[in-house]
UniProtKB/Swiss-Prot annotation:
One of its GO terms (molecular function) is structural constituent of ribosome. Belongs to the bacterial ribosomal protein bL19 family. It comes from the Bacteria. PROSITE patterns: RIBOSOMAL_L19 (PS01015). GO terms for biological process: translation. Pfam families: Ribosomal_L19. It comes from Chlorobium phaeobacteroides (strain DSM 266 / SMG 266 / 2430). GO terms for cellular component: cytosolic large ribosomal subunit. This is Large ribosomal subunit protein bL19. PANTHER family: LARGE RIBOSOMAL SUBUNIT PROTEIN BL19M, RIBOSOMAL PROTEIN L19.
């Protein structure tokens, strides 16, 4: 039974997204259906948590919109995700960045930048 579950998860897993870690600033293009029309909606923010593995992996993204903190839990393997772009890699010393919830203004999105070395 366990092998069957692994086969199903492996077949549904999406590998077309970059590696996402807590502290990264990401821009996610989501498909939104309104009536008969379908459009893309961008959600840009800091990844404060990732959870699960394989087909059940989710990330929590937080942004500040008009002075109000907005968090969205996004299943990474959802068919409603068009693309995920990592805008900035952040250096986080924690696995969960829930302390950002208590911060206001620019400090709420401030995570130290991480140097990324491209392999040649």
């Amino acid at each position: 039974m366990d092998q069957l579950i692994q086969l199903v998860e492996a077949s549904e897993a999406r590998n077309d997204f970059p590696a996402i870690n807590p502290g990264d600033t990401v821009k996610i293009q989501l498909k939104v259906i309104e009536g008969e029309k379908e459009r893309l909606q961008a959600f840009e923010g800091v990844v404060i948590s990732d959870r699960g593995a394989g087909g059940s992996k989710t990330i929590t993204v937080r942004k500040i919109s008009h002075g109000v903190g907005v968090e969205r839990i996004i299943p990474v393997n959802s068919p409603n995700i068009e693309s995920i772009t990592v805008l900035k890699h952040g250096k986080a010393r924690r696995a969960k960045l829930f302390y950002l919830r208590k911060r206001t203004g620019k400090a709420a999105l401030k995570v130290k930048a991480r140097k990324v070395v491209e392999k040649a």
